[in-house]
Curated annotation (Swiss-Prot):
Organism this protein belongs to: Anopheles gambiae
Pfam families, per the entry: DUF4519
First-listed, main subcellular location of the protein, grouped into a coarse class: membrane
Coiled-coil regions, chain positions: 8-33
The protein's name: Single-pass membrane and coiled-coil domain-containing protein 4 homolog
Taxonomy of the source species: Eukaryota, Metazoa, Ecdysozoa, Arthropoda, Hexapoda
Composition bias, Basic and acidic residues: 8-23
Protein origin, superkingdom: Eukaryota
Length: 60
């Protein structure tokens, strides 16, 4: 069994199960919140670079 931080007591089955559930919850949040946010930021950067580097044609 795993020792908890700062103490001599060991982790119980219930604590281990709760820890695993928390880890799964965090991974799910990663997929639903963090990755789409990074995607939007990346897309904004791509659009900004595209708009700043496109050739401009001056009308006569």
């Amino acid at each position: 069994m795993r020792k908890l931080r700062g103490g001599q007591t060991k982790e119980t089955r219930k604590q281990r199960q709760e820890r695993k559930e928390e880890n799964l919850k965090i991974q799910q949040q990663m997929k639903t919140i963090v990755l789409p946010t990074i995607g939007v930021i990346f897309l904004c950067i791509v659009v900004y670079v595209f708009l700043k580097t496109r050739p401009r044609y001056e009308e006569l």
